[in-house]
């Protein structure tokens, strides 16, 4: 009898484990099925060259940036500069750019759904509309003029990213060889989307963070004046400006982007206050942009000398911020309770209907409301 009881208990445990495992599999299947089916080894969706062979990528105006021919070969826009300007948004042929739509939104382009999988009796794949305007990307890429960097423009009221450019870039129809990528400095970081995944010294944009802290922590701020001679002694070194700004109040110091004044303010506010306001500004956070995580910024204020803190206060020293985070910080909505987070996937057109891309939950309304006028 005891043997029967033990065997029954063992059977119940095995049945429970089976149910638990099945439930876990079903949950993961529902959650990750689209990502599984869009794996590059799936020859139903990828051609022999490893290129996604279904779906079209279009900009906000309906200009087709990438599509596939009947034989499954992938094609790109017919202007080489536009191809370079939209490279990090659309993606390259081999899927080396992880932030490109051909990789990041492969499940949406494939037309995958729980009912029929990736098979569609009414067509091959979906049309994916981005919020980007290819013309804006073209203009921004031309303005970079071969320099390394990133350009981002968005509608802060809706969160739509209108322009997202990263350089250096290359023509996806004529990609550089592996040797060129390694040996030619012009292609350094070409696979990196600097707007989403890069960090840079914020420079003078960071002065707005210092100013916000000073407005709230220094009651006499708008009564103060400073005289800039082009070099201000802070601690054991000088904080320099490109030229002398003369006598200034806080408004003219901001307009002149005076390093000396903001270095002095940073020293007076101190490390802890600067760190608090930097965190509140979201510059150390990672944003989720259409399902992609941006790089988090880094600011180290611990144990700095007075001169180092002064340079940190003007966005130099060891300060690093993500371009997307800076863009979101500088574009708060003044009317909404929640500021929409940026996104660049607009909608996808399926054989059955046109559906919006999954929404972003948004981020809390910025604590920074701009610079109030002097009392």
Where do the model's predicted regions map?
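Periplasmic/cell-envelope proteins involved in peptidoglycan metabolism and beta-lactam response
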Residues: 1-179, 190, 199, 224, ...
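Beta-lactam-recognizing serine transpeptidase/beta-lactamase-like catalytic domain environment
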Residues: 61, 157-204, 209-375
